[in-house]
Structure formats: C-alpha cells, structure tokens
Amino acid sequence: MYFPSWLSQLYRGLSRPIRRTTQPIWGSLYRSLLQSSQRRIPEFSSFVVRTNTCGELRSSHLGQEVTLCGWIQYRRQNTFLVLRDFDGLVQVIIPQDESAASVKKILCEAPVESVVQVSGTVISRPAGQENPKMPTGEIEIKVKTAELLNACKKLPFEIKNFVKKTEALRLQYRYLDLRSFQMQYNLRLRSQMVMKMREYLCNLHGFVDIETPTLFKRTPGGAKEFLVPSREPGKFYSLPQSPQQFKQLLMVGGLDRYFQVARCYRDEGSRPDRQPEFTQIDIEMSFVDQTGIQSLIEGLLQYSWPNDKDPVVVPFPTMTFAEVLATYGTDKPDTRFGMKIIDISDVFRNTEIGFLQDALSKPHGTVKAICIPEGAKYLKRKDIESIRNFAADHFNQEILPVFLNANRNWNSPVANFIMESQRLELIRLMETQEEDVVLLTAGEHNKACSLLGKLRLECADLLETRGVVLRDPTLFSFLWVVDFPLFLPKEENPRELESAHHPFTAPHPSDIHLLYTEPKKARSQHYDLVLNGNEIGGGSIRIHNAELQRYILATLLKEDVKMLSHLLQALDYGAPPHGGIALGLDRLICLVTGSPSIRDVIAFPKSFRGHDLMSNTPDSVPPEELKPYHIRVSKPTDSKAERAH
C-alpha cells in the first residue's frame, strides 16, 4: 500500500516539485502551502479532544502519550490498523493480551471507515518494518484505550484512489468522496490560494473586501439569469451573473479598490463542464488602465501560486484578438505547443488547383495550413478521413492533406499541380521535416482559421493518445488576449449588434469615432487571461461617461435604458475612470491541481445537468407554498419537455 504525504509539504514547502498531479498526495503538502504564506504552522489540535493529528507524528515523538481521532483506513489480520485523519495516516498496533480484550474487540470489530478515538504511546517500528513511503513510517502507536465514536455501515464504494467510481456515484455520496486524498488536497489548496489572494490584495495593496447583494434585478443581454419570486405579484429578483454593476457603483462611491470572492449564477442549462453557481475573484479599481490591471493580476498569481508548482514567470505575453485568431484559430489558445497556422496564400496566387483558386478570388479569401510533426508516423488513414469529414460537416470546408516522404517529397492528390518552386517555398514557410503531415484549407479568413484551430487541438489529442507528449502537464502557459471587437452581429439578426462581452466595456481610445460611423470595426478595452487553452479571467476598462453609455445602450444595442437607470444616474454624478477583472476560481484551481473537471475542486458541485444528486435538487414545491408568490406551475407537454433536455 502506498501512504502519500501531503499536509506537511503544503505547509513547509516541497523538496521537489510533484510532476504527476494524479499521484496520491497526503499529509505534508498542505503544511507547505500554509508555510509558503509566511505564517507559522497552525495548531491543528487546539480546542479538541485529540493531542495530535495522525499525520504529524514522527520519531521525535517517541515515548509520548498521545490521543488520536480518525477513520479506520485499513486493518490486517487483527494485528494492526491504519488510522486516517485530514493530516495523514498512522499505524496502530492492536493489543493481543487478555487485559486489553475490550480494546481489541473495539478495534477488530469496527468496520472500515468507522470513527474511533485511541490513546497510547508512540513507539519505534521493529527493525526492517519501517515504511519510507509513509511520513509516519518510522513509528507506530501502542494502544492502551480505544473508543468507537461511530460505526460505519456498508459503503457504496471503497474510499481508495485506485478504486474507480462513476461521477454520478461520487456526487450522490459526496460526503464520502470528500474523504479521498485528492479531494482533500484540492479543497485545501483552494482555501490556501484564496487566503494568499486576500493577503496580497487587502494587506499589501489596500483593497477593500466588500459583499455585494445576491438578490438583484434582471440585466439586459448576457447569459440567462435565475429568477427568484417575490411576494409582489409578477415581480422577481434575479441572481446576479456577476457583481458587475455593483462594483462599478462602488467606484462611483469612492471605495477606490474593491475585491470579493463572489458567488455568481448563470442559468445556462446542460453544459458538460459548467456550473449554474460558481465563484470568481472579483476586482475593480479606480484611476487605472489596462496595463495596471494586468500587472496587478500577474503579481496576484505569482504571490498566491502553490510552492509545489514551478514559479509563475511575469510579465505574461500579450497577443491581440486578431493575432491569436490568425495564429491559433481561437481566442483562448493553448500555447504549450506549436502547430501554428501559417498563411500560404501568396504561394498559390497563380495556382491551377480549383478550390484554392476559387477561395482566393473572393473577398477575404485565404489559404492556410498547419504542420503535424511526424504525423505520417502517428496518424492513420481513418484519422485523416475523420478530419476531412469534420471539416465538411461542421465548416463546409475542404481539407487537403499533404504527406512528406523521404527528402520531403510530397504525397498528395494535388502534388502534380504544384510547381517545384511552390513546393520549396511551402517547405520553407511551414518548416516541415520528413514524415510531417500538412493540413491545408482555403476559404474566408476567419472560417479557415477557426477550422484549423479545431483541427490543431484534435490532432494534438490524437498524437498524445499515441504516446507523443505535446502539452506538458507541469507547464503553465499564461497569455493575455487584448483588442477584442466591441460588438458582434447578432446570430438571429446579423444587421443588429450585441456586445462582444458586456455593454459597460469602454471602446478603444483610438476607435471612439467608429461608434458613430462603423461600430462593427470598433475595438474594445477588454482583456482575457488564458491559461493552457482555458479562459481563466476576463475584464475591461469601463465606460464612465453617462452620455456615451446611453448612446451605446439605446442607439447601438437597442436596449431599454430604464432597466439600467440606477447605473446611468450614478455615472452622471462624477464617476471616476475605472476598470476591473474577474478570475474564474473554479477553473483556475482545476488547472493548478490537474483535475479532469471543475467538479473535482468544488465541495458540493452540481451535475452537468445542473442537479444536486446528493439532495435531489431541484425539487418540486407544493402549491400552497407557491401561493404567497402568486405563481402557478404549468407543466410542459412531453414534446416540450424533450426539447428542454
């Protein structure tokens, strides 16, 4: 059995980085994290009946009388058991003499995962029986007294990392799942990172931690919101999708620097890795520009970063929205690996290849390509067919695969239509080697880039399933993305505009004139923070001029300004220039811990359908309880219910 150690390391710092996030961690890691915040190690046994925790005992405690409380993790042949608490594991010797028969009975008959209290003496393990993999592996407890605090019924699953459980079963019995090493580590690391963020913001930089209301009013645009009925007929509160308006109002109120660990809510339906309620590190500052916000966040992450990971290197690189789309085909690129999109339009200006010629003859037409290193070695024919079918089905685009053989000769259906000079120029531009595969497409710029961006990730997945490591799991690659468009055409009516992010985002200073002539071309002062292909934060400089805010809302977005009259009125009373950002805490901790889902870093998450499987929530409410809210439930027909799911 492997006895992990994590709590003391979390406090005291690691002697070596943990390279595999999937390895069990216990005991010393938690201690290192607290120690890294320059605080003394907390006293875990104050105010309680135990004298020590299971994971803290060492050879320095030999001869001491101790009282321990915990769960029975494992028992062997009624001679010893392993006792577990949040701090770690310790071996307990079951007494065999008749004078201790009552103690033996308790410890031998209590089911695994029962809660017991034992008192005894710390002694050395017999020579040759030490366990170097276990932090307490040099000692054991010679028990004198024992008490069964609570017996455990038959478990729905074993609480061991190597025992596979379905996620539904884990969520149904979440209180048992929380006992696992990995969940303990995830939640304690989350707690310590938040503590260090508070320390950095409030103690070092003068931010004020302020709670904003949870009951608010419906906001125009943005994600769908949860409604909360009131006792006034036909009137509802709304759960805020972010404290956006409140934090701007705090700046108007002169608070200058605001911070909150904010609970937010979005009614987005069934999303595989989203939660209807989530947590963000919410920040707003007065008299700040984009550079100031970025520097603050870089320092915040550097200060709060766990010691068992490689340190955060600042400043983070920055790319514009146009650059990341052209290079990676997405606004949240994973920059841990290459396979960048290359524009090869100039090579084919005079081509005889039909679909390339057709694409280049149209406005914004382009020819793009990505190079899959050693793709000929790892990609199978069915993989290439799958890629081509995906391009046709989802993008209505054609993909042309080119295989490079020995001497980088081309193996492609169009090889005979490509001149030698074109072939050599492509090899130079794409920096290809033998056994590489080039995926080439042609079409409108944004569409071609988006397709290749999807295929870049798909091919990375394929290569990694075949043993090629492209994305180092220990590497954290941050990127700022800036200069987003301020508006996007509405999907349902492309002639109308909607905010690319939210309607309070200030336009780029160089593009303010475009609001009155060509608003579709206006850039915003919005910025996203991307980590390993995931957006972990987003913010902007806000509009602090009431007249400009009214113009954008009423004239460009066709929104009812009465719904935001409180904010517009506040901007009229001397609002300072201000800006802010929100970091998605759940997503950030998920990436830091290497967890497969954000549900693994939340104590009591919802399922992907938004259900709490432990308490069977949401639940129905009897009509008499709805009556004070003037609400009556009208159940949908079967066809409507099916569409809802």
Curated annotation (Swiss-Prot):
Organismal lineage: Eukaryota, Metazoa, Chordata, Craniata, Vertebrata
Protein name per UniProt: Aspartate--tRNA ligase, mitochondrial
Effect listed in the UniProt record for changing residue 263 to Q: In LBSL; no effect on its mitochondrial localization
Gene Ontology CC terms, in alphabetical order: mitochondrial matrix; mitochondrial membrane; mitochondrion; nucleoplasm
Gene3D superfamilies xrefs: Bira Bifunctional Protein, Domain 2, GAD-like domain, Nucleic acid-binding proteins
Modified residues annotated as N6-acetyllysine in this record: 382
Location within or outside the cell: Mitochondrion matrix; Mitochondrion membrane
Ligand binding (L-aspartate): 266, 542
Binding residue positions for ATP: 266-268, 535, 584-587
Effect caused by changing residue 184 to K: In LBSL; Significant impairment of its mitochondrial matrix localization
Primary residence: mitochondrion
InterPro entries, sorted: Aa-tRNA-synt_II (IPR004364), aa-tRNA-synth_II (IPR006195), aa-tRNA-synth_II/BPL/LPL (IPR045864), Asp-tRNA-ligase_1 (IPR004524), Asp-tRNA-ligase_1_N (IPR047089), Asp/Asn-tRNA-synth_IIb (IPR002312), AspRS_core (IPR047090), GAD-like_sf (IPR004115)
GO MF: aspartate-tRNA ligase activity; aspartate-tRNA(Asn) ligase activity; ATP binding; protein homodimerization activity; tRNA binding
Subunit structure as annotated in this protein's UniProt entry: Homodimer.
Family indicated by similarity: Belongs to the class-II aminoacyl-tRNA synthetase family. Type 1 subfamily.
CDD domains reported in the protein's UniProt record: AspRS_core (cd00777), EcAspRS_like_N (cd04317)
Reaction catalyzed: tRNA(Asp) + L-aspartate + ATP = L-aspartyl-tRNA(Asp) + AMP + diphosphate
Organism of origin: Homo sapiens
